[in-house]
Curated annotation (Swiss-Prot):
Coiled coil: none annotated. The gene is NDX1. Required for neoxanthin biosynthesis. Probably not involved directly in the enzymatic conversion of violaxanthin to neoxanthin. Is necessary but not sufficient for neoxanthin synthesis. This is Protein NEOXANTHIN-DEFICIENT 1. Signal peptide: none annotated. It comes from the Eukaryota. Disulfide bonds: none annotated. SUPFAM superfamilies: Acetoacetate decarboxylase-like (SSF160104). InterPro entries: ADC_dom_sf, NDX1-like.
């Protein structure tokens, strides 16, 4: 087992060594949320300005399954706190990145300056949710004239995501993603190309402010927003240090960051896009100089 694990890590390292750009292929759900500015600020460095309107910023999540990547097959959840402004550009800021690949986690932290953590992604399929979701979809898409094209299948794929550290596990959330049927019998949406710029860094592994870009090619179509919830009752768990704690305790590091991450996920979804035939090229990050400290960007109706 140890030898096999070593070979896998060496192969993954060799895969990342062929970049940048690093190429990821698979499928994803890109979901935008209205996140309270007060929640997003918990993740944004003080020298960066949060772009907000009426007390909210634009955050959300990027939930992906990669069939081909420098680290092989793995799942990823990027929780986006909001949009930050560092002249002359604005970019997304990740609150937390969860992956079920140790090498992908290492690369995210060491090379890209992301707040990456190892997690488990447990999946089941169900006709109906057994738990009442705390986030409900809305009619925002109808305002864009997209309502008739949004998938409304009855079945969902439930994903339970738990952060792991050694042999200790802490449940983060459950995500119910709509199943949209076989690709052979559905409209995949138009083929598009776009760039998703992001800021990163300001962590122990990368104290500098970084900027990188993801060049995305995929087929995109609007879908029903995923439903996200967290069970109200958790069972106690014994961690390696012998302490008994619930899965919501402070045994793992950054309890406040995890709490605010869940708050971002439970915020109001306004748009969900399904990315199929995804090919994403991630450029190497570059160091940028933070602009002088100013108050958050604010907009008003006057």
């Amino acid at each position: 087992m140890a030898a096999g694990s070593g070979r896998e890590e060496a192969a993954a390292a060799a895969g990342y060594g062929r970049g940048p750009p690093w190429v990821f292929r698979g499928r994803a759900l890109y979901q935008l949320h209205l996140v309270k500015a007060a929640t997003a600020r918990a993740f944004v460095p003080r020298e960066l300005r949060l772009v907000e309107a009426f007390g909210y910023t634009l955050g959300g999540m990027f939930l992906a399954r990669y069939d081909d990547s420098p680290a092989g097959k793995f799942d990823e959840l990027v929780v986006i706190a909001g949009i930050v402004w560092n002249p002359p550009t604005s970019c997304a800021w990740a609150a937390r990145v969860l992956v079920n690949s140790a090498e992908a986690c290492r690369h995210g932290r060491k090379e890209v300056g992301l707040p990456s953590h190892v997690a488990t992604f447990s999946q089941t399929e169900a006709d109906a949710l057994r738990n009442k979701p705390l986030v409900k979809s809305n009619s925002f898409l109808s305002l864009l004239g997209m309502r008739s094209t949004v998938s409304n299948q009855g079945n969902d794929r439930e994903i339970e995501i738990s952060e792991t550290k050694g042999s200790c596990t802490r449940h983060l959330c459950n995500i119910s993603v709509p199943l949209t049927g076989s690709h052979k019998h559905k409209w995949m949406g138009p083929a598009i190309r776009m760039s998703l710029p992001s800021f990163s860094g300001q962590i122990e592994d990368h104290p500098d402010l970084l900027k990188y870009s993801c060049q995305v090619e995929c087929r995109v179509r609007p879908v029903r927003p995923a439903k996200i919830w967290r069970p109200r009752i958790t069972e106690p768990q014994e961690c390696p240090d012998g302490k008994i704690s619930s899965k919501g305790s402070e045994v793992l590091a950054e309890p406040d960051a995890q709490k605010h991450t869940v708050m971002v996920l439970l915020s109001k979804p306004i748009l969900a896009l399904e990315f199929n035939s995804l090919e994403m090229h991630v450029d190497a990050p570059k160091i940028v100089i933070p602009h002088s400290k100013k108050k958050e960007v604010r907009y008003s109706s006057t």
